[in-house]
Design a protein with these regions (language model features):
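Membrane translocator/pore-forming domains, dominated by Gram-negative outer-membrane beta-barrels
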Residues: 1-240
């Protein structure tokens, strides 16, 4: 299956001390997925999110951050096999918390940024109603209780960042990054599964001369358990 997601977010940040920043945000999400397997089809999702985060400098080279977010989404699902076609509209609610410890060690034209991150998210799906069509007959009384889905993950990610247009990463407006990734996940639905795996990511970022705008693109590939995942993430940010 493949998914394309467009996200927008507005955030407000303030320094509450010399080494601590607090922020909060509101945002929206539009996602479109193609489903493959025994049933094939598509799913669209429109969602709204809100949350807060904090970043604290524990020392000159060690930083801690944490976040919490909540969201609600409306989903439209269409899928079918050779006999049965199913459609559904349903609402989900999600809550996520997480945090990370990140180091920053400068070595002339590159920096080493080891990171250990943890996140836990839970999605409430509940009863999902379906309309089914087969052999010219329609049944709109179909339903399934999907319950909840929770996922906990731990990621170790030693990132290396190179300066492309200056002698140090801090002075560079263009940067190249690479990071191997080591991941363990625990997913709970009606049953619980645990898997670990590894992957890698490569990124390219660019900042404006005034430091108010930035853009970056990242390519991520992971193998966790028997699942292969690949992502392309493009991000644009502007500070007012």
């Amino acid at each position: 299956s493949t998914t394309a997601t467009l996200m927008g977010r507005v955030a407000w940040e303030q320094m509450i001390s010399d080494d601590t920043m607090l922020g909060y945000f509101v945002g929206g999400e539009l996602a479109d997925s193609n489903i493959s397997g025994a049933f094939e089809g598509k799913q669209t999702r429109v969602a709204a999110t809100a949350g807060g985060y904090a970043v604290r400098a524990l020392s000159e080279t060690l930083f801690a951050d944490g976040f919490i977010s909540i969201g609600a989404g409306r989903n439209n699902l269409e899928m079918a096999d050779d006999v049965l076609a199913l459609t559904s509209d349903y609402t989900t609610r999600t809550a996520t918390v997480g945090g990370a410890l990140t180091g920053a060690y400068a070595y002339e034209r590159y920096e080493l940024r080891p990171e250990m991150a943890f996140s836990y998210g839970k999605t409430w799906i509940g009863d999902v109603g379906f309309t089914g069509v087969a052999y010219g007959l329609t049944d709109n009384t179909l339903s399934v209780d999907a319950g909840t889905v929770s996922t906990a993950s731990l990621t170790l990610r030693p990132e290396i960042v190179w300066a492309l247009d200056a002698e140090t990463v801090a002075d560079s407006n263009a940067q190249l990054s690479f990071a191997p990734r080591f991941i363990c996940e625990r997913t709970t639905t009606a049953t619980t599964t645990q898997n670990c795996g590894a992957g890698a990511e490569i990124g390219l970022s660019s900042n404006s001369e005034d430091g108010l705008s930035s853009a970056n693109i990242r390519f991520v590939m992971d193998r966790v358990g028997k699942s292969n995942r690949s992502n392309v993430v493009f991000n644009v940010e502007h500070r007012f």
